[in-house]
């Protein structure tokens, strides 16, 4: 994505900045997980200040920081290589992950500022970013742990939108967003219905980051357990009936690369 200290800026959307964020994030996760041995070797403490960069095309690089001042975009943490041999490897990787998360947010909202995002566009961008686990959560395994902890709380409430955090029966992932259960006469039933309504309103599409079209067809990814507008992932109700286990575009691409 273009962005620098000079020159005109063309209009960009929150979705475009999010795609840039997601690509950089994927590259950095790759460096700290599947390519970790190569990453470890490149971070030689005998070398100068090194940085971990993630790029929009889902690649990564360990290199020296940009020489230009001020830099074209915010720079990642300097000198990640210096602490490598003085820490436990897992702790060091977790530290790099934390700094990587901070850098990704800085870059995303740098673009948001330069492209003149208003309050609503910034909100959409943040919500889309916040739907993804942080690099730290992926590297330390906290993301999987959170999913497992949330699943038991939702097993008896299959209609709650928060069930996107747990595996759902096939019928739930192939149907429009489930309606809230009917209100009971007792007070506890009313509270539960209110909670259902609030959580349904807060459920965001994993692709466009909005909760528009509550009456439209939605589908849930059986891998990452996020909800999507059918139109955003090009899945119709008729086609969904023939899909046993649905994978969203992100999860499908990860499997192909693996």
Swiss-Prot record:
GO biological process, one term: regulation of DNA-templated transcription
The protein's name: PHD finger protein ALFIN-LIKE 5
Signal peptide: none
Biased composition (Acidic residues): 184-200
Zinc finger annotations (PHD-type) as residue ranges: 202-254
Note on domains (UniProt): The PHD-type zinc finger mediates the binding to H3K4me3.
Species of provenance: Oryza sativa subsp. indica
Family affiliation: Belongs to the Alfin family.
Keywords assigned by UniProt, alphabetized: Chromatin regulator, Metal-binding, Nucleus, Transcription, Transcription regulation, Zinc, Zinc-finger
């Amino acid at each position: 994505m273009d962005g620098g200290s000079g020159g005109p800026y063309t209009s960009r959307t929150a979705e475009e900045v999010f795609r840039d964020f997601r690509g950089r994030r994927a590259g950095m996760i790759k460096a700290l997980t599947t390519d970790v041995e190569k990453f470890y070797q490149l971070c030689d403490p005998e070398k100068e200040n090194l940085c971990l960069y993630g790029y929009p095309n889902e690649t990564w690089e360990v290199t020296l920081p940009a020489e230009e001042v001020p830099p074209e975009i915010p720079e990642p943490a300097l000198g990640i290589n210096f602490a490598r041999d003085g820490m436990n490897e897992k702790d060091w990787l977790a530290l790099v992950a934390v700094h990587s998360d901070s850098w990704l947010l800085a870059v995303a909202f740098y673009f948001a500022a330069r492209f003149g995002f208003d309050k609503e566009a910034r909100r959409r961008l943040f919500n889309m970013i916040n739907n993804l686990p942080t690099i730290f959560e992926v590297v330390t395994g906290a993301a999987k742990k959170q999913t497992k902890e949330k699943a038991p709380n939702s097993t008896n409430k299959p209609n709650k939108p928060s069930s996107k955090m747990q595996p759902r029966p096939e019928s739930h992932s192939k149907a429009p967003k489930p309606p809230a259960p009917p209100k009971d006469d007792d007070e506890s039933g009313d509270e539960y219905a209110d909670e259902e309504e609030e959580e349904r309103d807060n459920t965001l599409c994993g692709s466009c980051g909005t909760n528009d079209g509550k009456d439209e067809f939605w589908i849930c990814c059986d891998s990452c357990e996020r909800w999507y507008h059918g139109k955003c992932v090009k899945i119709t109700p008729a086609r969904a009936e023939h899909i046993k286990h649905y994978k969203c575009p992100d999860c499908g691409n990860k499997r192909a690369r693996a």
